[in-house]
């Protein structure tokens, strides 16, 4: 039975790139309404070439050999690899169909202070063989910074939505230190699909209910409906778009706003279809510390959240997600 759809507006975010203050405020108002509603909106007129993105990712998944995947696999799949974030997340025959490649900040080199200090969640990216996949790494690094810039622009809209100056968040969103990540996730079509989990309502699931541990999440996906969000009326399907980015507040933004912008609880329903899911998890840096606030004024007698260093928050949140939902 088809589930009703949640209300997910499409917002033209192009004014956030410009100088028209009135139009920017209007975009902020639309973001406010979306985040106080279903928690999701589609960002249109974002300026990203999503067809090229699809082409590169499809080619990558098509040409990677099993040995290449294993050589790049994170520690959970390859004990010889110390990486726990950057690397390949393997499909396991008969158990798990989804596979993905995750990469981090291209600025994380051996000379980066956090790499030299061995700070958790900071890893120098490992890449597929550049002779076999010559255009993959250059594209990925370019795409990372494209998405980081887009996310910073979107944060101007979030700042305006919260009654702040549009540049409120920018001092804390430095390129050199961002913990942001890209995941290139492939869900295959299979004749004999591995067992999948079932939600309490009987829905078959590829990934159970969860909150995104991020500042915001900016997702591109191909045109196969799969996401559901929990609303006051129960679970609802999220509409799809293969031209726009699906945006939602992460739990850190919820923490900062004392849940004025709560991170939406969502899940991935099982669909046996070939599709891509390509989230950009936008993060601040390890040492970022922003004081939480009440956008609509502090309720009488209510204590606000305490400031938490971003790296500590993310490390704890990602660990908790794996404990609850399992290794992706």
UniProtKB/Swiss-Prot annotation:
Which cofactor(s) are needed, names only?
A: Fe cation; L-ascorbate
Q: Which InterPro entries match?
A: DIOX_N (IPR026992), IPNS-like_FE2OG_OXY (IPR044861), IPNS-like_sf (IPR027443), Iron_ascorbate_oxido_reductase (IPR050231), Isopenicillin-N_synth_CS (IPR002057), Oxoglu/Fe-dep_dioxygenase_dom (IPR005123)
A GO molecular function annotation here is: L-ascorbic acid binding
Binding positions for 2-oxoglutarate per the UniProt entry? 275
For the ligand (Fe(2+)), the binding residues are: 210, 212, 266
Q: Where is the signal peptide?
A: none
Reaction catalyzed: N-[(5S)-5-amino-5-carboxypentanoyl]-L-cysteinyl-D-valine + O2 = isopenicillin N + 2 H2O
The answer to whether keyword Oxidoreductase applies is yes
Task: Name its pathway.
Answer: Antibiotic biosynthesis; penicillin G biosynthesis; penicillin G from L-alpha-aminoadipate and L-cysteine and L-valine: step 2/3
Which EC number(s) does the record attach to this protein? Answer: 1.21.3.1
Give the top-level enzyme category.
Answer: oxidoreductase
Q: For N-[(5S)-5-amino-5-carboxypentanoyl]-L-cysteinyl-D-valine, which residues are the binding ones?
A: 85, 89, 181, 187, 210, 212, 277
Gene3D superfamilies of this UniProt entry?
Answer: B-lactam Antibiotic, Isopenicillin N Synthase, Chain
In this chain the Fe2OG dioxygenase domain maps to 178-284
Q: Which residues bind isopenicillin N?
A: 85, 89, 181, 187, 277
- What Pfam family is a match for this entry? 2OG-FeII_Oxy
Keyword check for Coiled coil: no
The biological process GO terms on file are: antibiotic biosynthetic process
Function as written in the Swiss-Prot or TrEMBL entry: Removes, in the presence of oxygen, 4 hydrogen atoms from delta-L-(alpha-aminoadipyl)-L-cysteinyl-D-valine (ACV) to form the azetidinone and thiazolidine rings of isopenicillin.
What is the similarity comment for this entry? Belongs to the iron/ascorbate-dependent oxidoreductase family.
Q: Which PANTHER family match?
A: 2-OXOGLUTARATE (2OG) AND FE(II)-DEPENDENT OXYGENASE SUPERFAMILY PROTEIN-RELATED (PTHR47990)
Q: What is this protein called?
A: Isopenicillin N synthase
Q: Which organism is it from?
A: Amycolatopsis lactamdurans
